[in-house]
Regions:
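Mature extracytoplasmic/periplasmic domains
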Residues: 64-122
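Soluble non-cytosolic domains of exported or imported proteins
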Residues: 8-12, 27, 71-76, 88, ...
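Flexible, solvent-exposed loop/hinge segments that line or gate ligand/substrate-binding clefts
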Residues: 46-67, 72
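Solvent-exposed, polar/charged alpha-helical surfaces in well-ordered, non-transmembrane soluble domains
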Residues: 16, 20, 76-83, 92, ...
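Extracellular/periplasmic bilobal clamshell ligand-binding domains
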Residues: 109-145
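Ligand-binding pocket segment of bilobal, Venus flytrap-like solute-binding proteins
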Residues: 1-52
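Extracellular/periplasmic catalytic domains that process cell-envelope and extracellular macromolecules
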Residues: 19-20, 41-44, 59-61, 73-76
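Solvent-exposed loop/turn segments at secondary-structure junctions
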Residues: 30-34, 55-57, 72-73, 87-91
Length: 145
């Protein structure tokens, strides 16, 4: 891969290159593809998603988190927002408009276009055991950051 890989600036650029036939495949976050499919399909009309599965590292599931800074001058509003974000209504927005997997229903979520999370065959990884400085170094090295 080091000798033959092409580096693109971002998920959309990779998807455009695959769509145009410039490259035969690329690795992107699924929600870029679902978002484009739901709108114009301009960058994804000639593409399909492939999920690595079988515990392959390429099938990793990244996680997102949210919190409130202790220094925030709007603690109550921020807490209210987080409460909404983690509610059923908030998670429906996450799944239906951003194409992320919702926290509350990881089997299918509300967006039926998403492949059920429990069918993706992701490797077993404990996010709490990941070394964030090593991850950042690797992502920087390959141009993701």
């Amino acid at each position: 891969m080091k000798q033959n890989a092409k580096v693109y600036k971002g998920n959309t650029a990779v998807m455009k290159a695959v769509n145009a036939g410039e490259i035969s495949g690329g690795v992107i976050y699924h929600y870029y593809w679902y978002g484009d499919q739901a709108k114009t399909k301009e960058n994804s009309a000639h593409t399909k998603l492939h999920f690595f599965g079988n515990g392959d590292p390429g099938a990793f599931v990244s996680v997102s988190g949210a919190g409130v800074l202790a220094s925030s001058k709007k603690q109550a509003m921020a807490q209210k927002f987080l409460k909404f974000l983690t509610s059923k209504a908030g998670q429906e927005i996450v799944a239906d408009n951003v194409y992320e997997y919702p926290l509350l229903d990881t089997r299918t979520g509300t967006n039926k276009a998403l492949a059920p999370l429990d069918t993706l065959g992701a490797p077993t990884v404990d996010p709490a055991k990941l070394n964030s400085s090593t991850v950042v170094d690797l992502m920087t090295e390959v141009g993701l950051l």
